[in-house]
Each structure stands twice: as structure tokens, then as C-alpha cells.
């Protein structure tokens, strides 16, 4: 059976970047600093993890908090917050690691006979393990069915409070019932009785929280329209990503022809072409528009690089119908196929729709157990399947697996046999034993109160850190008179001036994002909150193209790093795919350069227009109008794509190292 790929992610711990993953045997969660190739700094045994907490999807920060059981009796449990820092896949990486940890912890608790089972819990709750499992599963992506059982739902207080926040009428009923309950009835018993009659509401709400919108046929939802003889097309970057995922052929055509064609021209021609009708599953007629760019791809394959979770899993040979057909040599129905199996005129349309349906369904999470994750017993039956088929109520109680303790030296357990202390340690112990804590604190407080009146002038805190506030030195206020560069101290003039300049630069940058300036004759007007219409003073169409270009570039970067991290560097298939993706990254940078050139061209046109307005105003009034700088242009585009360009250069540099054999 093919092993499950162990997830890993970029996560910071205590403001230090690193890599978090599980050991190959899935027994420990490890974190090691970047680049993640050294020994792990943090190693947490999965069996010692008592709780998993994750920030909700509405929070931009993705933090996974892992709680470990106390290492000593009476000690507090240790918590390890890991913040995932990947630019686009932080939430997916955190969900993957949390889902796998939740699955392993649930299996460990299900197989441990010393832990209470949810079915045997008391009437007031499902036990600590059930509450932990449910609390860790409320925000997970895929929940096992058993976490929707009655005991689990009644024990999950967080889910109940969330439901009452949504349903005000239910919250009002709960509060009134709680106020009118008898004093002899405990809060736990009241909660159990109250929610026992509303299990269906809890189950429906839990399922609603864990549902998400699936993929859909995006091409059928985009309809170009004509207004006043001009073609109108509304498409956003999310739709572009879906088109690239469902139709790799379109992504290949896009990568080969943009920036030769502009973004708007490419998509306008595509949605009017015959290829678009074919991919949507519509019949092509002789009256349809012909486009030499897209018509040559009508017979091209549209199934390249389609990821599939279902087809990637290994199927048991006993039910592998496709494999049996392969071995048996196909159909045995004579020379002529059945009438229903003969090709018809609409067969290409059916194949197109079936292919698209397979692509959409291929990445839908299955409701049953992943076959590749199941372990098999000696007779070939999956262990998980055999557990489901076994009649648990006919089995006897499992024998508790106790751990035998072997104690060799008991002398250290008694105070009379403690090892002897050194002379210095014994003297310190006697000194500390004779002191009274209240007297010591009083003496320290008295020394602090008399600092300014003891004749020594007190303590100059500025001088202790090397700062002279009376100095006229604007550079470094250090008391060190030696030549050479001096470090900036907290509170010095140089440090305050640096902080002031940094704040002013941030305000200036933020103001440039939120304001745009227009000139009417000799006057100019500053309009605030114009970032939605003209972000960074860029024209609306340029800003829209920049958004689409950024989204497609991020998609190419994501695919490059996914292929780079998930395969062997020496495999020929990976070398070929990495070469194709690296070429796509180079083309992406060319698209950004073309966009910057066009933005600069538009900026020059606006500047020429304003110069003409100023000259006309001078000719009419005889007064000179104030020149207002024009924003946008090449610098604005490069500033917006600064982080993206850095990622492109880093990825291309890594590919060059792979190509030269240094990685």
C-alpha cells in the first residue's frame, strides 16, 4: 500500500521561523529552525498531546496551539503555539497537520483500554477525552462520523455556545430555563438534560460549520455581453484560478501567449472562440467565430497535470474492475459493438462533460476511509474494516496493559538518606534558613527609598545605558568619547529621530494608497478613500490587470514549490515539470514588466494632458497654476509587485541550482 504523505508547513515559534511536521513513524510532532534540515528543537510525543486549538478561519493569523500533558505531577500543562507563515497555504498546512494529529490521537484513545470510552461515560458528559476530541474537531476540515454522536455533541460546550449566539430564541429559552431550575439540579445535569432533546439542532449546526463550497463548472457561469457595440466581460482572479485548475490546456495557452497579448484581449478572444464552446460542452457550428490562436488547440489534450485524490489511491484487486478489464483484454462481444456503445454525433460533448465532472469530483474528499491509509492483517482484510464488522458487544472486557515499574535504588526516596551537600551549599542553606523573608524585603525597600538621600546622588539611569540627554550630539548620544561608529541607545536623540522618520514614512506610504489627486484647470483636488477606484493612483483597468497578474503569478509559484517539495530532485519527470514551471515564472516576470511599461505610458499621457490644461489656464488668466505630481506609473507597479518579484527571483535561483546539480 502507498504510504500517506506526511504534511509539513512553515511555522514560527517564539518569533523564530522553522518547519513543523511529524516523524516518519507518526509518533512525534517536531519543529526545527529553517532550513529544517537539522535536528528538531521541539519534539512532542503524540501520545502526550492532550488538546489541539486552532484560530478560526475568519482570523488572518493561523496559529495551532498544541497542549502537552504535565511532565510532573502537579505541574501545569505545557502549551506550544505555532504560527504558520506561508503566504498562501498557511491555512491548508495547519489544517492538514491538525487533521492528521486528531486522527492519530483519536485512534490512540480508541485503542487504550485504560481511558474511558464515550459510550460508557456518565450522564453529565462524555468524559475528558471526548470533550478534547470534539473541541479539537469543531474547526477541522473533515470530521469522522463518530464525532457527531450524541455524547460528543452534548459534551461540546463551545459548539452549544456558538449555536446560541446564532439562535437568539434558543439562547433566551436556555437562560430562562436555567434561572428557573431547582437548586438541587447541578449545571452539568441541567446542560445534559437541556441538550438531550436538541441533539438534532447540534448535529445540523456542526455539519453546517464543517461544510464548504465545492468546485463548479466556472466556464458556464461567465457570459460575455455586448453593450453599445462594445464587449463587456467580468472575470476575477478566483475564476481565473478555477479555469486553470479545471482546464490545463487554457493555462498552457495563457502561458504561451501572454504578455504577447494583453490580459483583457486574451480573455475576450478566448470566450468568443470555438475552444471556449467546446470546453463548456456546447455544440460547435459553422457560424461560430474563428480564431487562429485558439482553433489550433481544438484537438489538443485537456487532461494534462490533473490531480486526483481518488485515482491516486490503490484499489484492492478484488474490486478493481478497470484492472480486470486490462488483464482480460477488453470487451468480448464480437466484432460489432452494441448499438448503445457506438459513437454518435454528440459523443465529443458527452466526453467533455464527463471529463469536467471527473476533474471536479476527483478532489472531493471521500466519505469513507482512505484505502491507502488502512493497514492490513494477515488474511488481507483491512484492520479498520475488520473493526467495523466486528461485534463489539460480544467481546469481553479488554485486559488493561499496565506498565511494570522496576526501581533499583530507593535510597533517594527518604530524607535520611539524601546525598551529602558540599560545605558551601551547606553554609548557604544555613544562611537562608536563618533569614526572615519579610525582613529582607523591608531592607531592600529601605535601600530603594534612600537612594536619592544617601549622599551618592542616586542612580542615573540614562548614564547607566550610555545616554546623555544634555548632549548636543545629533548623531549618537553615547558617553563613549572614542572615535568610530557608536551604537544607538534607547531614548537617545538619534533613536528618537530614527523612530520619527520611520513613522512619517509609514504615514506617507499609507496616504499614497488611500488618496488620489486630480487637477481641474488651475486647482487641484485631493480625494480620499479612492483606493478601490484607483489604488496607488493606477488607472482602473491597469489595477484590475495587476490583480489578475498577481493571482496567476502566485498560482505558478505555488505549483513550482509544490512540485519542488514533494518529489525527488533526480527524477526525470520532476526535472521536466520544474523546467516548464521555471519557464512559466520567467514569463510571469515579463508580464509584470509589460504591465509596468503600459502603466508608465498611461502616466505620461496624463502628465501631457495636465501640462496642456496648465498652459490653457495660463493663457486665459495669466496666472501660473501649481504643478501637482502624477502618481502611478512604472514605480507604482513595481512597488506593488515587490514581494511577488522577490518570490519569482528566489524560485528561479533555486531552479538554476537544481539544474546545475547543487541541490
Curated annotation (Swiss-Prot):
Residues 452-491, 513-535 are annotated as: Disordered. It is found in: Nucleus. Residues 453-465 have a biased composition (Basic and acidic residues). CDD domains: PH_TFIIH. Keywords: Nucleus, Repeat, Transcription, Transcription regulation. Pfam families: BSD, PH_TFIIH. Residues 147-206, 227-278 form the BSD domain. Residues 515-528 have a biased composition (Low complexity). GO terms for cellular component: transcription factor TFIIH core complex; transcription factor TFIIH holo complex. GO terms for biological process: DNA repair; nucleotide-excision repair; transcription by RNA polymerase I; transcription by RNA polymerase II. It comes from the Eukaryota. Disulfide bonds: none annotated. InterPro entries: BSD_dom, BSD_dom_sf, PH-like_dom_sf, Tfb1/GTF2H1, TFIIH_BTF_p62_N. SUPFAM superfamilies: PH domain-like. Component of the 7-subunit TFIIH core complex composed of XPB/rad25, XPD/dnr-10, tcf-30/SSL1, tcf-29/TFB1, tcf-11/TFB2, tcf-14/TFB4 and rtf-1/TFB5, which is active in NER. The core complex associates with the 3-subunit CTD-kinase module TFIIK composed of div-66/cyclin H, prk-3/KIN28 and rtf-2/TFB3 to form the 10-subunit holoenzyme (holo-TFIIH) active in transcription. Component of the general transcription and DNA repair factor IIH (TFIIH) core complex, which is involved in general and transcription-coupled nucleotide excision repair (NER) of damaged DNA and, when complexed to TFIIK, in RNA transcription by RNA polymerase II. In NER, TFIIH acts by opening DNA around the lesion to allow the excision of the damaged oligonucleotide and its replacement by a new DNA fragment. In transcription, TFIIH has an essential role in transcription initiation. Belongs to the TFB1 family. This is General transcription and DNA repair factor IIH subunit tcf-29. The gene is tcf-29.
Amino acid at each position: 500500500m502507498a504510504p500517506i504523505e506526511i504534511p509539513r508547513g512553515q511555522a514560527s515559534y517564539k518569533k523564530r521561523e522553522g518547519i513543523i511536521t511529524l516523524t516518519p513513524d507518526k509518533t512525534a510532532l517536531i519543529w526545527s529552525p529553517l532550513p529544517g534540515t537539522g535536528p528538531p528543537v521541539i519534539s512532542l510525543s503524540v501520545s502526550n498531546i492532550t488538546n489541539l486549538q486552532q484560530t478560526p478561519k475568519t482570523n488572518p493569523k493561523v496559529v495551532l496551539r498544541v497542549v502537552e500533558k504535565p511532565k510532573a505531577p502537579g505541574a501545569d500543562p505545557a502549551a506550544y503555539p505555532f504560527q504558520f507563515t506561508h503566504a498562501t497555504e498557511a491555512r491548508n498546512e495547519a489544517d492538514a497537520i491538525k487533521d492528521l494529529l486528531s486522527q492519530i490521537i483519536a485512534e490512540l484513545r480508541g485503542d487504550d483500554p485504560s481511558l474511558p470510552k464515550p459510550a460508557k461515560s456518565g450522564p453529565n458528559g462524555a468524559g475528558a477525552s471526548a470533550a478534547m476530541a470534539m473541541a479539537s474537531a469543531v474547526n477541522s476540515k473533515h470530521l469522522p462520523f463518530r464525532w457527531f454522536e450524541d455524547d460528543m455533541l452534548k459534551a461540546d460546550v463551545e459548539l452549544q455556545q456558538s449555536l446560541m449566539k446564532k439562535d437568539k430564541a434558543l439562547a433566551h429559552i436556555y437562560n430562562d430555563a436555567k434561572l428557573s431550575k431547582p437548586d438541587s439540579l447541578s449545571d452539568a445535569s441541567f446542560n445534559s438534560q437541556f441538550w438531550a432533546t436538541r441533539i438534532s439542532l447540534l448535529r445540523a449546526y456542526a455539519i453546517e460549520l464543517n461544510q464548504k463550497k465545492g468546485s463548479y463548472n466556472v466556464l458556464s457561469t461567465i457570459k460575455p455581453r455586448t453593450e453599445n457595440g462594445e464587449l463587456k466581460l467580468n472575470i476575477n482572479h478566483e475564476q481565473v484560478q478555477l479555469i486553470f485548475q479545471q482546464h490545463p490546456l487554457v493555462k498552457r495557452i495563457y502561458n504561451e501567449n501572454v504578455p504577447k497579448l494583453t490580459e483583457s484581449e486574451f480573455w475576450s478572444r478566448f470566450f468568443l472562440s470555438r475552444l471556449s464552446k467546446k470546453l463548456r460542452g456546447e455544440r460547435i457550428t459553422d457560424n461560430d467565430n474563428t480564431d487562429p490562436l485558439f482553433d489550433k488547440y481544438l484537438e489538443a489534450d485537456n487532461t494534462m497535470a490533473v490531480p486526483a485524490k481518488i485515482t491516486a489511491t490503490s484499489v484492492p484487486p478484488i474490486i478493481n474492475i478497470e484492472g480486470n478489464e486490462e488483464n482480460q483484454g477488453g470487451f468480448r462481444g464480437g466484432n460489432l459493438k452494441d448499438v448503445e456503445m457506438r459513437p454518435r454525433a454528440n459523443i465529443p460533448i458527452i466526453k467533455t462533460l464527463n471529463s469536467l465532472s471527473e476533474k471536479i469530483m476527483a478532489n472531493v474528499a471521500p466519505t469513507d476511509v482512505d484505502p491507502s491509509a488502512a493497514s492490513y492483517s494477515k488474511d488481507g482484510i483491512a484492520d479498520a474494516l475488520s473493526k467495523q464488522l466486528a461485534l463489539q458487544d460480544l467481546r469481553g472486557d479488554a485486559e488493561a496493559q499496565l506498565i511494570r515499574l522496576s526501581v533499583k535504588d530507593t535510597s533517594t526516596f527518604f530524607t535520611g538518606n539524601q546525598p551529602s551537600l558540599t560545605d558551601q551549599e551547606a553554609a548557604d542553606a544555613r544562611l537562608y534558613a536563618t533569614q526572615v523573608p519579610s525582613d529582607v524585603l523591608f531592607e531592600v525597600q529601605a535601600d530603594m527609598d534612600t537612594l536619592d538621600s544617601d549622599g551618592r546622588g542616586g542612580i542615573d539611569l540614562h548614564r547607566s545605558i550610555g545616554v546623555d540627554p544634555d548632549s548636543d550630539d545629533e548623531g549618537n548620544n553615547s558617553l563613549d568619547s572614542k572615535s568610530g561608529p557608536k551604537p544607538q541607545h534607547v531614548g537617545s536623540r538619534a533613536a528618537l529621530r530614527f523612530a520619527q522618520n520611520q513613522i512619517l514614512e509609514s504615514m506617507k506610504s499609507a496616504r499614497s494608497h488611500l488618496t488620489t489627486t486630480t487637477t481641474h484647470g488651475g486647482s487641484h483636488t485631493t480625494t480620499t478613500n479612492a483606493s478601490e477606484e484607483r489604488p496607488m493612483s493606477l488607472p482602473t483597468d491597469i489595477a484590475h490587470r495587476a490583480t489578475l497578474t498577481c493571482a496567476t503569478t502566485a498560482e505558478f509559484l505555488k505549483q513550482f514549490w509544490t512540485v519542488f517539495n514533494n518529489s525527488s530532485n533526480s527524477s526525470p519527470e520532476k526535472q521536466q515539470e520544474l523546467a516548464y514551471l521555471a519557464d512559466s515564472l520567467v514569463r510571469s516576470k515579463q508580464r509584470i514588466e509589460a504591465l509596468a511599461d503600459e502603466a508608465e505610458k498611461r502616466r505620461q499621457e496624463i502628465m501631457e494632458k495636465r501640462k496642456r490644461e496648465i498652459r490653457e489656464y495660463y493663457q486665459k488668466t495669466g496666472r501660473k497654476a501649481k504643478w501637482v505630481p502624477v502618481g502611478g506609473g512604472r514605480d507604482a507597479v513595481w512597488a506593488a509587485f515587490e514581494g511577488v518579484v522577490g518570490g519569482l527571483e528566489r524560485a528561479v535561483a533555486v531552479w538554476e541550482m537544481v539544474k546545475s546539480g547543487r541541490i
